[in-house]
């Protein structure tokens, strides 16, 4: 059964720019999918459709059986409870510690403090920051900040982890460390969709690769690769 279905999707902005044109993608539960393409190719727009940051101009986007394109704004929070989202720029709150940043994602659930602590510490340990749970973001490296971002995204055990250029600001060694964490999360059953420019990661992990070029899905390969001439 497919956890995500994108059917005949078009996205055109008010300025007349067409970001996506007739996109069709099916993603089964437990998959790991890289979405690649050059800058302004439309790959980030496709990612944003999945968590309803954007709405399609035409077509349908199903996530967990729900057509998110028709979801009313007041219902979007229910969709995002099922998702974990990791951004390129971390989006951490600088005045909160590692623990507090991760716990912040659970505030809306009204969970008992004991359960919150258990979930938060488990997520922090999974990303390898157990010894730094009291540290503030300014005292962490870029890679450590991204680990916090991942912990926050997975603290409520989402069915889907959406990563939009999660290694874009990191050096190659740190990027591989972050990718190892994301891959392990996938191996534990979480579906992962990751937009990336990182050729080395794509070529090393040999996952399914979807290529977007000028708003068009031009290739979709199992165990694909990132080839420079193919990207252009």
Named regions from a protein language model:
Residues 51:
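Helix-to-loop junction immediately C-terminal to a conserved catalytic motif
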Residues 59-67, 79:
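Conserved ABC transporter NBD signature motif
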Residues 96-104:
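Short coil-to-helix segment of the ABC ATPase nucleotide-binding domain corresponding to the Q-loop/switch region
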Residues 136-140, 144:
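Conserved ABC ATPase signature
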Residues 155-159:
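A short, proline-enriched helix->beta-strand linker immediately N-terminal to the Walker B motif
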Residues 161-164:
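Catalytic Walker B motif of ABC-type/P-loop ATPase nucleotide-binding domains
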Residues 172-174:
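Helix N-cap at the start of a conserved alpha-helix in ABC-type nucleotide-binding domains
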